[in-house]
Curated annotation (Swiss-Prot):
Family assignment from sequence similarity: Belongs to the adaptor complexes small subunit family.
GO cellular component term, pick one: Golgi membrane
Name used for this protein in its record: Coatomer subunit zeta-1
CDD domains registered for this protein in UniProt: Zeta-COP (cd14829)
Cellular compartment(s): Cytoplasm; Golgi apparatus membrane; Cytoplasmic vesicle, COPI-coated vesicle membrane
Keywords, in A-Z order: Cytoplasm, Cytoplasmic vesicle, ER-Golgi transport, Golgi apparatus, Membrane, Protein transport, Transport
Family annotation (InterPro entries): AP_mu_sigma_su (IPR022775), Coatomer_zeta (IPR039652), Longin-like_dom_sf (IPR011012)
Annotated function: The coatomer is a cytosolic protein complex that binds to dilysine motifs and reversibly associates with Golgi non-clathrin-coated vesicles, which further mediate biosynthetic protein transport from the ER, via the Golgi up to the trans Golgi network. Coatomer complex is required for budding from Golgi membranes, and is essential for the retrograde Golgi-to-ER transport of dilysine-tagged proteins. The zeta subunit may be involved in regulating the coat assembly and, hence, the rate of biosynthetic protein transport due to its association-dissociation properties with the coatomer complex.
Organism, as annotated: Arabidopsis thaliana (Mouse-ear cress)
Amino acid sequence: MELPPKVKNILLLDSEGKRVAVKYYSDDWPTNSAQEAFEKSVFTKTQKTNARTEVEVTALENNIVVYKFVQDLHFFVTGGEEENELILASVLEGLFDAVTLLLRSNVDKREALDNLDLIFLSFDEIIDGGIVLETDANVIAGKAGINSTDPNAPLSEQTISQALATAREHLTRSLMK
């Protein structure tokens, strides 16, 4: 029986290697200091590369790390050495594109910190207990709340539950007239 792909962590670091948002799904780094040491080694190994246009891949401490940079943010997804790097790359692209949608294409550290709740919701929509659930950025962003801010959006751009709520609201208004 083939096991589903597993992710060990998702890291979002700033341009100095400091945490913006991180989530670990593995006990490979049991303490906070072990996690920070891993984050530092990942950042140090990748900081001189140019991963601004394409996802890059590297091996570190028996792990595969895929990463991409934008402005002052560095996105990383880590899997075991047996994981398929294309799957890890699709997880990273899904995360990156979902964050871009959620932050309305203004992807930088300040905006990420202001919307940390949406970023962590994105993590939760992509991965559950290390198992990949979703990689489609539109689905991830939709579930994390991109459409909940505009109740006047066309029905075609709303989720089913949001569309039903809007229809119910319109029906209630028309009945009260």
